[in-house]
A protein has these predicted regions:
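Short, Lys/Arg-enriched segments at the junction into DNA-binding effector domains
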Residues: 4, 115-135
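The feature encodes the CheY-like receiver
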Residues: 15, 57, 84, 102
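Charged docking surfaces used in two-component/phosphorelay signaling
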Residues: 16-24
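Short hydrophobic/Thr-rich beta-strand motif most characteristic of the beta2 strand and flanking loop
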Residues: 26-33, 41
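Acidic catalytic/metal-coordinating carboxylates
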Residues: 34-37, 60-63, 87
Length: 135
């Protein structure tokens, strides 16, 4: 089954561009155009990764991130025009796994998605495969 990515982005052209690239890469995609819809879709379950804008109608991306972190460890990559160092620090300290600023190269975003999904899958897989012999 394809990994499912939720795009929470209010700029429709950008959301559609990212969606098409992700579909081309073999991911399943769901979109939300505002923070409240994004929260509902994320809480419904089955999401493997969230791409999250900061400036959203209805609920800010930071508030959505705070609420997600209360109940979930799903990887979240912030995708935003907010490029000040303190914006990045706030996003990462609030619980984002990664932070990329607009404009971005799609190849970099795809690489960051693969890395975040690898980390999520690798933690569970790696724990079973590690053993320590006699010391």
């Amino acid at each position: 089954m394809a990994e499912r990515i939720l795009i929470v982005e209010d700029e429709e052209k950008l959301a559609r561009f990212i969606e098409l690239e992700l579909l081309h890469e073999g991911y399943a995609v769901e979109k939300a155009a505002d923070g409240r819809d994004g929260l509902e879709k994320a809480q419904a379950g089955g999401v493997d990764l969230v791409l999250l804008d900061v400036m959203l109608p209805g609920m800010s991306g930071m508030e959505l991130l705070r609420r997600l972190r209360r109940a979930s460890d799903v990887p979240v990559i912030m995708v935003t025009a907010r490029d000040a160092v303190m914006d990045k620090v706030t996003g990462l300290d609030t619980g984002a796994d990664d932070y990329i600023t607009k404009p971005f190269e799609i190849e970099e975003l795809l690489a960051r998605i693969r890395a975040a999904l690898r980390k999520r899958g690798g933690a569970a897989q790696g724990a079973e495969g590690l053993t320590c012999g006699a010391l």
